[in-house]
Curated annotation (Swiss-Prot):
It is a peripheral membrane protein. The complex is composed of two ATP-binding proteins (PotA), two transmembrane proteins (PotB and PotC) and a solute-binding protein (PotD). It is found in: Cell membrane. The keyword Membrane applies. ATP binds at G37, P38, S39, G40, C41, G42, K43, T44. GO terms for cellular component: ATP-binding cassette (ABC) transporter complex. It catalyses: ATP + H2O + polyamine-[polyamine-binding protein]Side 1 = ADP + phosphate + polyamineSide 2 + [polyamine-binding protein]Side 1. This is Spermidine/putrescine import ATP-binding protein PotA. The keyword Kinase does not apply. The lineage of its organism: Bacteria, Bacillati, Bacillota, Bacilli, Bacillales. PROSITE patterns: ABC_TRANSPORTER_1, ABC_TRANSPORTER_2, POTA. One of its GO terms (molecular function) is ATP hydrolysis activity. Belongs to the ABC transporter superfamily. Spermidine/putrescine importer (TC 3.A.1.11.1) family. Its EC number is 7.6.2.11.
Amino acid sequence: MKKIIKVEAVEKHFGNQVIIPPLSLDIKEGEFLTILGPSGCGKTTLLRMIAGFETPTKGNLLLDDEKINDLPPYKRHMNLVFQHYALFPHMNVEKNICFGMKMQKVPAAEQKERAEEAMRLTQLLEFRNRKPAKLSGGQQQRVAIARAIVNNPRVLLLDEPLGALDFKLRKDLQRELKNLQRNLGITFIYVTHDQEEAMSMSDRIVVMNKGHIEQIGTPKEIYNKPKTLFVATFIGENNIVKNGEGYVAIRPENVKVRSVEEPILKEYHLGHIEDIEFVGNMEKLYVRDEKTSELLMAYQTAEEAAQWSIGDNVYVGWEQEDEVTLN
C-alpha cells in the first residue's frame, strides 16, 4: 500500500521542553490509523503538526513525498474534525456543509451536488434545513464530518471527535465512521485516549507514551502481542509477572483457575480467591498466588465462577504459549 504521509525524525519543542523527541511514522493511503495514548503523550501535538497548525522544531513531514513543513493548512488537502463541532449557529445543516465550498467559489450546482452526497453518507438528508440548536450532539458531529469530507480531502484528521458523546451514541458513531471511511477510501488519522474506540475502528494503531511511539500494529497485534510494559498495562487488562530479569504478560482470559481436588499440572500454583467482580458477561476472579504473592486476574463465565467463593483455595496457572515477553 502506498505511503501518503511520512513523518521523518520529527521533534517538537516548546521553549526548553521537548514534547516529542525524534519520531518517525509512515501512514498508508486509504487506511484508518489511530494514534492512541494517555493525556499529555503528544498525540494531539503530532496531529496538529500533520495538519499544519504546529511547525516541527526538527525533522520533516512529507505528503506524497513532498516536504510540507511550511505549507499552510489550507494547501495540504487535509481537513480536521474536533471534539467541539464549531458549527455556525445561524446556518442550517446544508449551509454549514456548503460554507467551505462557497468560500472557494465552487459553482452553486456543484455545491448542492456535493453537499447532497455528503449528507447521504452521514445520514443527514432529513435534517438539511435544521439549525445546530435543533440537532442532537451526534447529529451535530455528523454535520462537522460532512463539512470535512465535502471538499474531497486526501486525509481526514479527527481529534477525539466522539469524546463528548454518551456511550451508546459513541458506539453507534464508531461504526458509522468506519463504514464512512471504507466507502470514501480516504486516509483517516484518528486521535483518542479510548482504547476500545481504537480497537473497534482501526486498521492500525500507533500507541504513544511521553512523546515516543511504543508500538505500531493491527488491533489484534497490539492486544495479543504487546511489545512493552506500557502497552501491556495500557491496552486492556494484563497480569504482569516477573520472569527472570524481565516480565511476561498474560491476559486474564488465559489464566485458569482449578479446584484443589483436581489433578493439576506442575506449572500451576496454589492460591486463594481474594475477590470476585461481576463485569457483565464475565466474572473476574482475583487470585493471590501463594508462591509468588502476585495478585492474578482470571476471567470466567458466570456458570464457571458460580462454584467459587471469596477465600476458597484454588490452583491457578496458564499455558506457557499464552505468555508474552515484554521489553
